[in-house]
Amino acid sequence: MKMLNSVSGSFRKKAGDSRSRECRTRLERRIVGATNRWRFPQDHFCGDLLALSQMCNVLNVDLDEALKNPDRLCISKFQKLFSENIMNSGTQSGEADVILECLGFKWELHHPQIFQSGTLAKLYLTALIQNMKSSQRELDKVQKAHPSGKIKKRSPVKKIIISMRINDPAVTRVAFALALKNLYMKEVEMTVDNVLGVLASAHILQFNRLFQKCVNMMMNRLAPSTIKNFYLAGCKYEEEQLTMACEKWLAMNLVPLVGTQIHLRQIPEPLLYKVLKSPRLFTFSEFHLLKTLLMWVYLQMNCKVQMVPIHETILAFFNSFPKKCCFLEQDPGQNWMPLFLCLRLHGITSGKDLEVLKHINFFPESWLVRVTANHYHALESGGNMVHLKDLSTQAMRFGLLFRQEYTTYSERISIYGYFFEIKGIKHDPTSYSFSMQRIKHTDLECPSPVCEHSTISLRSERLVKYEIQAQTLVDGRWQEFRTNQIMQKFGFIKPGCKSHVLKIQTVGIPIYASFAFIFPAS
């Protein structure tokens, strides 16, 4: 009794460290044995000598030996011990010896398999201990009734019945059946439609191998139609590996893929915010990113729309709001202000695009005044972006999506009268290179949307700070390649007109190539 009191006292001391920790620990306690004493399930041996003794009786293990190293009796060891005892006794057969009552069904199982599930193992051990007590009481009664007579041969051991209640609506009978099937087979086919239910079943069953299998499948099946549910599942089960995979995938595909489909509506706002803040975010230009975000807001406010709206429809919708203040300062838009603060509006330099920003009455006037003032000062100083310092968070950003059918692909851009060509080249099936080059305005085809509404700089050199990066998905993992942050003067004559070349070797396709740069003062 002194030993039990001292052990109990030590638990009270640990649990009293802080109020929050105490509350959390109480929620995790469970009852063990006939004495209804509390124990902590996360510990292998918690000082409960009676429970340890009961386990030793079931496993036919010497109590004195178990006390020398009680942790060896953790559940992960039970399967091996039970299997050895069954094989030695010669009672192993193919007949099910465990009945699981769950979801209105009775599932026939075998105890060697259920030890892959922490939940089923605990239920089984609890039921087994209770059966041992009941059998012992029956044997004592028989011995008292026939002290000197012969005792009839005992009937075969009854099947052990365990029951479990599941309240998670994600767990369907089909999904639960697939989870139990995985106890017996390593390769059980799952689909995108039922993987969430199997994941929920694996979580409840504490079936780690199956849970990880579901996570791996979900990471490899990310698509516009699945990204929402897979991300929410990762948050629900605190599976950082899955949530990070969703964030990385969406950072690459928000603009080029999801932003072109009605599934954009389903993207949760917290996920969208993380992606907009990500330095890995891919976009063709800042205006492309703005259009994607405007469409997301439009779809949130027009839930009945089932077709992807054209850009003019979205602009007309926001322009229809009262002109007394901008959309982001009115009730519907105030909650989305943090999303638009992630945009780099200074990266929108086209006169035509700036006119769009002004006329849709979406942004606060102070934002537009600041953007316009920065553009004016940059043009006045020959392109110097004195208001931009950090390349990773403030740079102008442009992108190329290099697809499988391309051998070469390029786009031309104009900033403050300077013209550049960003280009990707495929040298062989696994070798690519990406670079940027300054070009003359006379090299552009006229009329050209690049030079339309654009000024022309006659300066022979332009100091540029830039970085080129490329990302692609290979076997479920993102490969990333990048240059350092490079400071270089770009002229019109080779080799001074061309940037450093990013050369990569990969089997991944498509390749998301991003170009970020600013014009330092010169």
Curated annotation (Swiss-Prot):
It comes from the Eukaryota. This is BTB/POZ domain-containing protein 16. SUPFAM superfamilies: POZ domain. Residues 166-222 form the BTB domain. Gene3D superfamilies: Potassium Channel Kv1.1, Chain A.
